[in-house]
Amino acid sequence: MIRAVVDSPQNEHTLAWLFLDLLVIEHRCAPGMDTVVLEMTLPVGSSPALHVHDSLDDTWYILDGEMVVRCGDDTLVVGAGYWVSMPRGVPHTFRVVGDQDARILLVHDNASFRDFIRALGVPAAAYVVPAQPVFPAMDELARVARAHDLTPIGPPMSADDADAILAATVH
């Protein structure tokens, strides 16, 4: 018999991780599916290094908050209700802006990013953003990232860059 997969915060199958300055909740999909869904809570100011995935389209739906996104030569301001899909091979980064944490659903067609989170994350005892970020040594972070199809190629987006993009954008 095929059964539906249902996760909830109280479900013993739901995995949650503290990763860098993020809370990551891993949602299960039906058996045999390659789809990976991660719910991430990102604090204001959170910004990953400019990076590229060679075999993963980085796709997310924004549930809460506002972000400035750089994908290739494009910059945009996005918020709740936006769907963002950045193609593999294109450098990208973002920064959470405003006065509210961002909450996004990542939807990926392979497990490389989820496995990156699992490799460096710390199991979360509660569904809250870590009070103290969990940052591994930068050389370890870069090594594990590259092993999971994430190649850092530049710095995170600075607050000044995000502010300049916000100032130039009518929203």
Q: Regions from the language model: what does each represent?
A:
Residues M1-T35, V128-H171:
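A short, N-terminal "cap"/entry segment at the start of jelly-roll beta-barrel domains
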Residues E39, V52, C71-D73, A80, ...:
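Residue-level recognition of conserved beta-strand positions in structured domain cores
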Residues S47, H53-Y82:
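A short beta-strand-loop-beta hairpin characteristic of the jelly-roll/cupin
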Residues V68, R88-R114:
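Ligand-binding loop in jelly-roll beta-barrel domains
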Residues D115-P130:
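A hydrophobic, small-residue-rich beta->alpha segment in the mid-to-C-terminal subdomain
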